[in-house]
Amino acid sequence: MAGNKPFNKQQAEPRERDPQVAGLKVPPHSIEAEQSVLGGLMLDNERWDDVAERVVADDFYTRPHRHIFTEMARLQESGSPIDLITLAESLERQGQLDSVGGFAYLAELSKNTPSAANISSYADIVRERAVVREMISVANEIAEAGFDPQGRTSEDLLDLAESRVFKIAESRANKDEGPKNIADVLDATVARIEQLFQQPHDGVTGVNTGYDDLNKKTAGLQPSDLIIVAARPSMGKTTFAMNLVENAAMLQDKPVLIFSLEMPSEQIMMRSLASLSRVDQTKIRTGQLDDEDWARISGTMGILLEKRNIYIDDSSGLTPTEVRSRARRIAREHGGIGLIMIDYLQLMRVPALSDNRTLEIAEISRSLKALAKELNVPVVALSQLNRSLEQRADKRPVNSDLRESGSIEQDADLIMFIYRDEVYHENSDLKGIAEIIIGKQRNGPIGTVRLTFNGQWSRFDNYAGPQYDDE
């Protein structure tokens, strides 16, 4: 067999013996731990799953060890045994046996590892050192960006730093996930049921929407849920979503976070002042206010400033990574978030997938669901509807009307459509009435809830008349 070279430890360790570079810091690593992992796998193939849950090939410091682990993974996937002979043959077929130190080095790995008993601990060491090296690499990247910002502002650089560091943390967190025994799941479930039993909540177990009949249908906006609010133009989807945010902010102390990709923050705030003060938004936009209007607005401003729990980000063209990093920052600074609202989903961008809109929307949808789950917070995302529904006699939306609907419908836990008959029929008997159509609810019923629409105030309110279920 080719590659029968004597063992040379320099094959495993980077050669940095030049006196001129002797003072350079070597990135953290443990050659011994890496060798013990590789040798242990050759001794006991049954430990592969334990190791694969902890490390990937890139976690190994030396290139030979990365090649060896990659080849082990290939053998495992093909159902072949991993031992000295099969590994050497496989590496030789790939033309990499000499580059990893030859047959002699593989034999040395196997010989110097007496057992695989502690292989999980060795794998943890390999992974730990890899994470620290990633942090060093990111720190260097951030430093280089600081010296050469290429037109980026300090805020842009902060976002870059946070997103890169959080990416490492997210990768590390994912390594800790996995199957849970039913006993552990039952313990957590019973604890949650006991908490709900002991705390009065009037049937609202999530974030209170502020709408009694909607709360009855949904039990509130649930933590970790992706909630889609969709409607055709002029139906009031931004108004409805903002009302959900306002109600959540008024009824709890946790911060609520708004990503307004379409509307500047000042315009958002004008709408909120109109909604909460019950002052005509046209009068606010034009400044034509009387003393009573000013009194109402001043009272609302006092409440908002006292609570200080609404955050607005009106950056345009945000990516999922930017949304995640900014949401994490608010959550970290305040010990959690009550609600996240994004207006609207189709304005987000994934530069790497910009050539394929379907894949881009799928990645945006998936990332928002992942964010909701990670921060354990309801994420309300607004979405457009296809124009095709305008051709139907009954223009009430259904799930298939969601633009790029496949991935959105699949990822969403709750889908709510807004329909106001008066938009299409000037003489409608339902003037001032909005229908909130629940098209999908993963853990509850679908159906329709009526609300009163007060457009002059940019406000949806509880409906005093009968609901559909009552008629």
Swiss-Prot record:
Segments crossing the lipid bilayer: none
The organism's taxonomic lineage, starting at the top: Bacteria, Pseudomonadati, Pseudomonadota, Gammaproteobacteria, Enterobacterales
Disordered as annotated region, ranges: 1-27
PANTHER family: REPLICATIVE DNA HELICASE (PTHR30153:SF2), REPLICATIVE DNA HELICASE DNAB (PTHR30153)
Organism in which the protein naturally occurs: Escherichia coli O157:H7
SMART domains: AAA
Originating gene: dnaB
Occurrences of domain SF4 helicase (ranges): 200-467
Matches recorded under Pfam families: DnaB, DnaB_C
Keywords of this entry: ATP-binding, DNA replication, DNA-binding, Helicase, Hydrolase, Isomerase, Nucleotide-binding, Primosome
UniProt subunit comment: Homohexamer.
Positions annotated to bind ATP: A231, R232, P233, S234, M235, G236, K237, T238
GO molecular function: ATP binding; ATP hydrolysis activity; DNA binding; DNA helicase activity
GO cellular component labels: cytosol; primosome complex
Enzyme Commission code(s) on record: 5.6.2.3
UniProt similarity note: Belongs to the helicase family. DnaB subfamily.
Catalytic EC class: isomerase
Catalytic activity: Couples ATP hydrolysis with the unwinding of duplex DNA at the replication fork by translocating in the 5'-3' direction. This creates two antiparallel DNA single strands (ssDNA). The leading ssDNA polymer is the template for DNA polymerase III holoenzyme which synthesizes a continuous strand; ATP + H2O = ADP + phosphate + H(+)
Xref: InterPro entries: AAA+_ATPase, DNA_heli_DnaB-like_N_sf, DNA_helicase_DnaB, DNA_helicase_DnaB-like_C, DNA_helicase_DnaB-like_N, DNA_helicase_N/primase_C, P-loop_NTPase
GO biological process: DNA replication, synthesis of primer
Classification via CDD domains: DnaB_C
Described function: The main replicative DNA helicase, it participates in initiation and elongation during chromosome replication. Travels ahead of the DNA replisome, separating dsDNA into templates for DNA synthesis. A processive ATP-dependent 5'-3' DNA helicase it has DNA-dependent ATPase activity.
Protein name, as recorded: Replicative DNA helicase DnaB
Disulfide bonds: none
Entry-linked SUPFAM superfamilies: N-terminal domain of DnaB helicase, P-loop containing nucleoside triphosphate hydrolases
